[in-house]
């Protein structure tokens, strides 16, 4: 996990550590701190790779400017995603990128709301921050790819389908159809992000 996701995971692990201890215990936290900070190794490796390849650890920020990529408010992102889903000039790109990006948010946010009282706060906190950070990009083309790594949401979906075999079959079938459609579009040269 690199850049923001690895650092985000540190926050979630820290919240889980404090919650699992039941109280704030400085000594116990210090003993476990190396494990909590372990995801930072990925971020440091990413920065080191940037330094080795491009000469500066934060060179990726300059490279992202070429794609008009940066952080922006989630409301601004959702607004341009909605506009592009409704009226992007290339219908294939609208169907392959913008509409799925909007539908994924529409599916993931209610799932997060469902889970907020059923799961430990670490899971919902991490999932919320993950969703908001991924939808706070100035040119979001890869929401599906980003959300495919949002593991807490898969736990939430599993809890939603627990003891509901019809819903389980419906979701599994829908995901299978979605996977096949994604693969088909990819094989035909579609804009699969």
Q: Which ranges hold each PLM region?
A:
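Hydrophobic/aromatic-rich transmembrane helices and adjacent perimembrane loops
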Residues: 2, 8, 141-161
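Signature aromatic-anchored transmembrane alpha helix within multi-pass, membrane-resident enzymes
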Residues: 36-40, 163-191
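Transmembrane-helix signature of polytopic, lipid-linked glycan biosynthesis machinery
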Residues: 47, 125-142, 176-192
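Membrane-lumen/periplasm interface segments of specific transmembrane helices
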Residues: 2, 6, 10-108, 114, ...
């Amino acid at each position: 996990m690199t850049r923001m996701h690895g650092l985000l995971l540190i926050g979630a692990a820290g919240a889980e550590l404090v919650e699992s201890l039941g109280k704030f215990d400085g000594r116990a936290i210090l003993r476990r701190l190396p494990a909590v900070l372990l995801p930072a190794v990925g971020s440091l490796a990413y920065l080191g790779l940037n330094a080795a390849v491009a000469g500066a650890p934060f060179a990726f920020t300059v490279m992202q400017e070429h794609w008009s990529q940066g952080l922006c408010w989630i409301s601004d992102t959702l607004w341009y995603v909605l506009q592009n889903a409704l009226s992007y000039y290339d219908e294939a790109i609208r169907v392959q990128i913008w509409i799925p990006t909007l539908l994924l948010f529409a599916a993931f946010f209610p799932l997060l709301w469902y889970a907020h009282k059923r799961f430990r706060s670490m899971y919902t906190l991490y999932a919320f921050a993950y969703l908001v950070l991924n939808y706070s990009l100035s040119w979001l083309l890869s929401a599906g790819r980003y959300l495919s790594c949002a593991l807490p949401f898969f736990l939430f979906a599993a809890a939603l389908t627990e003891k509901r075999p019809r819903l389980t079959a419906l979701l599994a079938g829908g995901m299978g159809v979605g996977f096949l459609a994604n693969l088909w579009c990819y094989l035909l040269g579609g804009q699969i992000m």
